[in-house]
């Protein structure tokens, strides 16, 4: 997936500026994002878009898919405002801001001209840029990933209950959420289901290259 950091930054900020609810500090939020690595950070360390600009690209991908899902399942009219979709999609991964750092990773490069050999063939060692999670002392910690993202977002945008639930639980029932039972949460809050679906479609289908 080709990523244009500057174009994505412009689009992300343009969407965020459409949030106009009382109490929202959008200017402060944008300043926070621009003062961080949000627009240049990866979306993960290994699984999807683990490249510069991946986090912002993923957030926009989730937004686009979320809009499509809402239009698909609510053809007669969405129960959610455009503002709600913008907020939960763009902000669901705020926890990943300033979370990762670059390090040099040694990898095997296989070719017929390799000077070394293993069971897979000839290779040479090469150094590539990779990402890893910072130590807990060097990044924001509050709760699990979803809770961290909800807290950061709520600092700048007053969230309605369903928005908070959606951001907090967007990863679904993985290990970090145990011993929570996600079924009653998803049964009560459809926005949480839709955000979860959009996130997973983006991660495992659209960005799975």
Language model regions located:
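Non-catalytic interface/linker regions that flank or bridge core catalytic/transmembrane domains
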Residues: 1-41, 45
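Generic structural signal for well-ordered, non-membrane alpha-helical segments
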Residues: 5-9, 55, 59, 160
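Polar/charged alpha-helical tracts
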Residues: 10, 14, 28-31, 71, ...
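Generic alpha-helical structural signal
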Residues: 10-13, 27, 60, 64, ...
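Amphipathic alpha-helical segments within well-ordered protein domains
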Residues: 13, 17, 63, 67, ...
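Extended interaction regions within the primary functional domain
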Residues: 24-35, 70, 174, 184-187, ...
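A glycine-rich, hydrophobic loop/mini-helix early in the fold
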Residues: 30-81
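Divalent metal-dependent catalytic cores for phosphoryl transfer on phosphate-bearing substrates
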Residues: 47-51, 57, 75-208
């Amino acid at each position: 997936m080709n990523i244009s950091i500057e174009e994505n930054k412009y689009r992300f900020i343009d969407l965020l500026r459409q949030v106009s609810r009382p109490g929202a500090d959008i200017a402060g939020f944008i300043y926070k994002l621009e003062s961080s690595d949000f627009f240049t950070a990866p979306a993960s360390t290994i699984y999807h878009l683990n490249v510069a600009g991946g986090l912002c690209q993923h957030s926009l991908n989730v937004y686009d898919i979320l809009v499509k899902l809402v239009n698909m399942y609510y053809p007669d009219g969405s129960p959610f405002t455009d503002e709600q979709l913008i907020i939960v999609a763009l902000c669901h991964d705020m926890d990943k801001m300033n979370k990762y750092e670059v390090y040099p990773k040694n990898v095997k490069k296989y070719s017929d001209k390799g000077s070394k050999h293993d069971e897979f063939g000839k290779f040479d060692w090469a150094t590539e840029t990779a990402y890893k999670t910072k130590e807990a002392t060097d990044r924001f910690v509050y709760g699990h990933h979803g809770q961290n993202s909800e807290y950061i977002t709520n600092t700048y945008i007053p969230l309605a209950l369903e928005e908070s639930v959606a951001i907090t639980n967007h990863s679904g029932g993985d290990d970090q959420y145990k011993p929570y039972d996600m079924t009653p949460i998803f049964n009560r809050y459809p926005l949480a289901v839709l955000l979860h679906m959009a996130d997973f479609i983006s991660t495992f289908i659209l960005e799975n290259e």
